[in-house]
Amino acid sequence: RSTYEQWLVQCPDFAATLRDCGALYINRKSVRGWGETTAGYSRVIKEGMEGIKAHIHKVLDTLDITRPGDYEKIEYLKAMELAADGISALGHRYAAEARKLAEAEPDEKRRKELLQIAGTCDQVPEKPARTFREAIQSMYIYQTCIFMEQNAASYNPGRMDQYLYPFYKADIEAGRLTEEEAQELLDCLWVKFSEQCLFQDQVTAQFSAGYPMFQNVCCGGVDERGMDAVNDVSYLILQATAEVQLYQPSLSVRYNMAKNPSSFLKKIAEVIKLGTGFPAFHNDEVGIEMLLNKGIPLKEAYNWNPCGCVETNLEGKQRCYTAYADFNLGSAVEFA
């Protein structure tokens, strides 16, 4: 009745024995979704579910159910549309709940906050984000839906400083947002990232208790032209990790010695010095070269991000997974 049951039937007896005694852990990808990807967050923020559904309909118009191979494509696209509707619906449910709470809220300041939340969730993720606040909300509702559907670790927001910066810049210039308010929003987002958890089977829960979600956020590096991509949001992201100091999100930096400023390196060092284990420090040029060696065009390779724990990844284009079985070396010594 499930993928897991199919996997159990095919699992050799010796492997099941080693798993049951704690010597080998092989359940992870059989009991949940795959993860290990950066799932098109920038597109969701820019287009909203409406834009994505419009693209689905455009492709559907080119297909013919009588043409070999098209039936499967049609069913797949209809499933995508259904998922998009579900993501939009969750946003509207949050909006309705915020309005309900606002009606019963005696504190005027909090009531206004709740109404602002309602207005934000009415807009996103169904429609394109218009502000920094809406962009963050759109991304996080989408993230929540991914976990609801997949129940897997390592769904990576990726290069947040790149896709959030245009909204931040526009809001700052229009006077809608201050740097302090933007920092608070990111700090709150960091807290929400740490709320995500998985539903585990007994073996997985015992073997990987405390296993984090590896939601890898990346900042720094270069843009699609190979130029310095560090911006104000890059520093705000580093500061969020410094201020919140929770185990999620996993923060990585791409540092390009030839392109990124020394002030960025100094900020990275200040955060590392706190002892939280973040950010992970990645040589940007090596990451680019790894993708070039896979045949990825240079313009696309410039946009790589560390994924999970950790693989080089391209947003919306790759799923990378480098470890399936975990071996307990201590048990090998004990058995010997």
Question: Where are the model-predicted features located?
Answer:
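A conserved hydrophobic secondary-structure block that centers on an alpha-helix together
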Residues: L101-K109
